[in-house]
Amino acid sequence: MKTVLVTGVAHGIGKAIAAKLSEKYCVIGVDKELPEHIFCDTFYQCDLSNMQELQETIIQVKNRCESLYGLVNNAGIFIHKPLKDQNILEWEKIIAVNLTAPYVLSQALSPLLHHGHIINIASTRAYMSEAGTEPYSASKGGMVALTHALSISLAGSVSVNSISPGWINTDESYVATVEEKAWHASGRVGKPHDIAKVVEFLLEDEDGFITGSDFVVDGGVSKKMVYP
């Protein structure tokens, strides 16, 4: 069975990705928190903002696996506060988790990914944003750029793509309003499994022709004019 490593598996999109992939793949999960429901064959607890912990986890993965079929850089953190109230420590932590860790993991594990896949979970905030999300938006814009750069550096060996989700409702108790649904051409907000299905699709491209691309999965909200 092919092995796929997924970061950020404890909640939300990462949890859905791990659950979906566990149907076909051996899943290695990495997260700072212990998942309530583990859909992983192997789990490593790691704070991705801590470089020492990250390097130790990479060593453990290399000792366990001779090869990987996929690396899904999903883990991410988000803050939403006025620009004047943000601080450099928040910036550094968001960049560390959302951008530096995917770079380090991709660099370290790409030799194990011969004819495999790297899939980065970015965000539509790489293209459009709102006030108070500067660190997060910058990190996700960087992830899209990292994706196409890696696709060139690893050309012929590893396919590298990113997925940019829009509004994905990761709170099962939240019910979107009629207005919020109407913002989307799809008529609803996204669900974590919407992203998991795209990850599965990209992993099934065994010929590796799909590479260097970003897939916007937002129910059409970024294409629909919404007037206040």
Predicted features and spans:
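A conserved structural motif in NAD(P)-dependent oxidoreductases
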Residues: 184-195, 206
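Residue(s) in the substrate-gating loop at a strand-loop-helix junction
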Residues: 123
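Short C-terminal tail/terminal secondary-structure segment
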Residues: 128, 200, 211-228
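Alpha-helical segment proximal to the catalytic Tyr-Lys
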Residues: 111, 151-156, 208
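Substrate-binding pocket helix/loop in short-chain dehydrogenase/reductase
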Residues: 82-83, 90-92, 180-181
